């Protein structure tokens, strides 16, 4: 069995060597690595080519800059292994990463998705986010768990499943695209397994752009995608997805409040949002009354009032 590893990189010449070296160090050796160079203007491509010349398992695919979700799709198309996994270029994995993710396959060869844990590094603090003990859940059961797999990385995906549902992965989303991809793919899964190990090292850097700094357009794209998912029958009883929808609407409104665009332009932007899904059953346990009210205004297309309130509330 071969595992395809996909690393999407844009101007990552400084951090990429650590990531690639962690792949080379894997105790499970039957892997191939595809580095998708998404239009880098630094030495990323040259660096990967040097690695490829030393290890035949390493491959470079270069394309014009199209964004992270498009790069991930390119990686899926390139993958030749039976299973695949994503690693972000500025992260790295422990040497047992692949071995641990493959472990459930010994007893459950039908597995389409195996979710592992990760270590989160932020502001000098390390937080362990562990998946449940190795066990099987149907996708509909998974969404009720307090632990819910949002990232697309730290996951072993069945390659044929990913290729079959390639069209479910939205393009040109550069913010929280891994969350959106997960929400799009889960309704198609037959099963989900968990590996309790946290071998993935996830870094939140001080240079990362905050949501407040993101453009209205970026947040509009991701909020629209999450709203569409929240309206799917599959997700309508999910506290997690319902809260996620409110979360991105709030971030969008905060960006609106800091935008220099005219009210008419902001109203035009908000009109592009799919109607959000709201349900009174979630109000007391998940959402504050203010956020619920803003979403109610969106649902009833009170765009001018919403822009006015956002300017007051978030400034």
Predicted ranges, named:
Residues 22, 29, 37-46, 88:
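A conserved acidic beta->alpha catalytic loop
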Residues 94-171:
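Flexible acidic/His/Gly-enriched loops in nucleotide-sugar-dependent glycosyltransferase catalytic domains
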Residues 12-25:
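Short, well-formed alpha-helical segments that are part of the catalytic scaffolds
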Residues 84:
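Short aromatic/hydrophobic "clamp" motif used to bind/position activated sugar donors
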Residues 198-205, 211-238, 250-276:
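Catalytic core of nucleotide-sugar-dependent glycosyltransferases
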């Amino acid at each position: 069995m071969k595992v395809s590893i996909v690393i999407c990189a844009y101007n990552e010449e400084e951090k990429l060597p650590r990531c690639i070296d962690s792949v080379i160090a894997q105790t499970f050796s039957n892997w191939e690595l595809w580095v998708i160079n998404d239009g880098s203007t630094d030495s990323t491509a040259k660096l990967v080519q040097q690695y490829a010349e030393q290890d035949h398992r390493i491959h470079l695919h270069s394309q014009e800059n199209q964004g992270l979700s498009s790069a991930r799709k390119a990686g899926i198309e390139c993958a030749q292994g039976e299973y695949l996994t994503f690693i972000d270029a500025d992260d790295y994995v422990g040497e047992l990463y692949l071995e641990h993710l493959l472990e459930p396959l010994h007893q459950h060869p039908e597995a389409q998705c195996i979710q592992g844990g990760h270590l989160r590094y932020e502001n000098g603090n390390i937080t362990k986010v562990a998946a449940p003990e190795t066990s099987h859940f149907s996708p509909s059961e998974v969404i009720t768990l307090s632990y819910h797999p949002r990232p697309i990385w730290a996951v072993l995906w069945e390659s044929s499943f990913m290729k079959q549902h390639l069209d479910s992965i939205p393009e040109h989303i550069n913010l929280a695209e891994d969350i959106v991809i997960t929400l799009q793919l889960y309704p198609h899964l037959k099963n989900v397994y968990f590996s309790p190990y946290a071998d993935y090292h996830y870094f939140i850097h001080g240079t990362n752009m905050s949501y407040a700094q993101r453009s209205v357009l970026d947040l509009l794209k991701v909020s629209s995608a999450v709203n569409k998912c929240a309206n799917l029958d599959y997700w309508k009883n999910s506290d997690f997805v319902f809260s996620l929808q409110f979360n991105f609407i709030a971030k969008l409104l905060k960006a609106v409040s800091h935008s220099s665009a005219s009210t008419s332009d902001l109203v035009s932007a908000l009109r592009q949002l799919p109607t959000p899904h709201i349900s009174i059953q979630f109000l007391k346990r998940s959402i504050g009354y203010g956020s619920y009210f803003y979403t109610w205004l969106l649902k009833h297309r009170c765009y001018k009032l919403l822009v006015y309130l956002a300017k007051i509330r978030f400034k």
